Amino acid sequence: MFIANLCAVKQVKMYKQQNFLRHFLFLFFFSLLSFQAFCGVIKGTIVDKKTREPLFGATIQVAGTAFGTVADREGRYTLNVDTGTYTLIVKFVGYQDLIREGVKVAENQEIHFELEPDTETLDEVKVTARKNLENERVLQVERQNATIAIENMGAKEMSLKGISNVEEGVKKITGISVANAGQLIVRGLGDRYSTTTLNGLPIASPNPDNKLIPLDLFPSATVKNITVSKVYVVQSFADYSGAHIDIGTKVHTGEDFFSVGMNVGGVFNTLGKDFYYSDREGSLLKTGNIDSKYLDMPYSSFEEKVKEKDIFGTSFVIEKKTALPDFSGNVGWGKSFGKLNVLLSMGAGNEKQILKDAFVKQFTAQGRVLNMFRYNSYITKFKIAALAGLSYTFRHSDYLNYSLFYARNAIDEFMERDGFDSEGVTLRGSNSVYHAYSLLNNQLSGHHEWGERWELNWAGSYGMTGSDEPDRRQVMFRKNENTSKLSLFLLNQQETMRYFGELDENELVGDVKVAYRFGEKNRLHFGATYKRKTRDFRCASFYYNLDNLPSPEIFNIYDTDSYLNFENVANGNILIKRSYQPRNRYKAESKAYAAFAEVDFFPFPTLLINIGVRYEQINQSVDYFDDGSIKRKSELKNGDIFPALNIKYTIGERNSLRFAVSRTVTRPAFVEMAPFLYRESYGSAAIRGNAAIQNGYNINVDLRYDLFSKKNNDMFSATLYFKQLNDPIERVQEAEGGSAVHTFRNSKNGIAMGVEVEMRKEVFKNFRLGLNGSYMYTDVKLPKDGGIYTDNQRALQGASPYLINADISYAPYLRGGDDRMILALVYNVQGPRIHSVGIFGLGDNKQLTLHTLDWVGSYSLGHHWSFKLTVKDLLNSKVRFRQDVPQINDKLEVEAFRPGTNAEIGFTYKF
């Protein structure tokens, strides 16, 4: 043992002796030579026998000893042992153990191992059992043997398809698409019907209009895998009928590593072009919000203070630069200290995009153009994410995990508009918007086993999310139709303005689950969960009264500093009016108490019955001010029981038939249950909640057939589903003060049904086809009283009748397996869907069918270097919207823009 240990560190010891004991150099030289004669090294690779895919995390151990090691990301291992003859044991979850006896170990000996999959040993795999796995084969085995129907995507598949974040990843899963503003649509059901968790625990959303957190906050560099379940299981909260999306962050389990990566690229129609932007306070990590004292001080004091000091620190000037390439980079480090594993990862980047010659129109019910604006949009995105993970293993199978995840996405957009309003006035506009979303999440979890029957899993998390919109600015100019000269538009003092909005949300979660094994495979599960969420929102607008300002000579919309400046504010030529009413802020809280019990029962070996029940008590409240500035409180308290049944019948070794039925709930969001007038941002729709809103309840039925190949990753899956939506919550429009206001009502009923198909096929070695598609039908009946919407019955907003994803990949190993090349084409088609609901006699505004095609190429050179080239949207597709105008029996185009083709090249070096 002494010789083996000294062998593993002999170079380090030699270095220290040379520095501190130089006069004993000769003695130590001979000592090391003598030890060298007894040192042996085994190295090689551990791969999948069929696919040749490296098995990252596979273990190799010397039988009867504590000597062992773990394969790295390339499947490579190095094991230092004494020279001699041994028995080696190679293991990897989901594969048959390989035992090789009589291995004679000498210096620098290479031995390669090929493992065969063994799904029979994984019959008891649960959905939450492998959130730390990346390997596609093992994820397929997990999917095959899971108690409930799931779909998953690992880091390796995300890399192969050029997926940069979780949002792009879930769009490749059957029946899922992403609509405008990042809203997730699953089986035709909108954002409110799904839920998102991080490592199995709920996470809050910083977007008050969306239930789900923006999924592009999670870059692929920090993600181990994504698991999607479209059927309900009672171990989760019952507020989903669309999908439960769990994001598993990476955990260090393999060989120590340090990696550095960098990418450069850009959109073809943006690179090298003139790029316009506005000045900003703050930075990528810090938002330049207005000091709260200027909001809280009396109005008379504010009028004086705003003349004494420039409280904003920014101007309305728009500057110009040349669009340079986009840059991004990431750093990763993982190391094991005995039983303690540490992982650190960080990435940051920026993106720029120009939407040129886009337009948006509004029509009357008679088909006349009410208003129309052409616009150019200049968008800059800043993204940063960091992950720290600690895992500690003790006893035989107990462990503790801690993870800290931080992400921040900021979007800075300048838009110039040119057109006419509903009064026929020709206008030009300058609009600057900055929106930042952030997430800071802490998680601590543990797993403990007692004997062969009892198992305890516990977890806790505390998350903070934020949504800031600091200093949105607008200036509107009137354009003389004859001379094209510009002047400030002075209609009602709202044409030149600033807007500030802040939202902070905190969420605390505690979760305990216990499992008891009885019989050979049967299990009883029970547990409890506590969740508390708080939200604090406020916004303020500042309107510029320009009536006293001498008419300036205006040459363009960019150079405004000669007249829209602090000097004119100080001398009284410009009056700044603050709009910060009590109704501009609200506080909200939600408390959830839940308990569940379920059993996995095998009446006979091929039939699994999972039956369970969950109880949830939800107390939700919103403190707000009504239009008369009177303080109000809106509350919703419900205690409900949610049963679920999941049946799996295994036919032969690779076929299975699954059936699921459950009852779930759809709860109103905070802003939907409080009847105050609210705008999430300036220019967005006015929203008024409904104090009479109630929960909606859903009955979900799924039938699925799965076929998995015994030899490789080939598979086929087909699913039929039906959902009965009782009292569904729908966003509707009502007339208020001569204009449309969005509100929320319980509709009569709705349905969603469809079929999903998925397949993967290896045509020949290293050449693979993938395809998934869905066809769906949705229908909802709206209340006939009070609304100004044109149709009382329609498809669900955001639902496409069909979705298709396809990919072709070729991934051979070269140079004797040292190198690997990957070439892939990834295609997506999204059918037409309702973008906005038609009102005042107009039909629905629909986004037309959209096709996208991406190309991904990568090359791994030896142990250290890898290179990648990605081209997204090869078709340079145009996004188009058309609205039905029933009175003239026509469909008119109301908006169109072209995002542009994007290319990126990058490299990664692993030390």
Model-identified regions with their sequence ranges:
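C-terminal beta-signal and adjacent terminal beta-strands/loops
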Residues: 829-836, 858-911
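Surface-exposed extracellular loop regions of Gram-negative outer-membrane beta-barrel proteins
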Residues: 201-202, 410-412, 466-468, 487, ...
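Transmembrane beta-barrel wall of Gram-negative outer-membrane proteins
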Residues: 312-415, 438-444, 450-451, 645
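Gram-negative outer-membrane beta-barrel transporters
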Residues: 721-724, 743-834
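Outer membrane beta-barrel strand-and-loop segments of large Gram-negative receptors
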Residues: 491, 498-499, 503, 509-511, ...
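Periplasmic N-terminal accessory/gating domains of Gram-negative outer-membrane beta-barrel systems
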Residues: 132, 141-185, 200-234, 241
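Short, acidic, small-residue-rich periplasmic hinge/interaction motif at the N-terminus
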Residues: 47, 59-61, 91-93, 106, ...
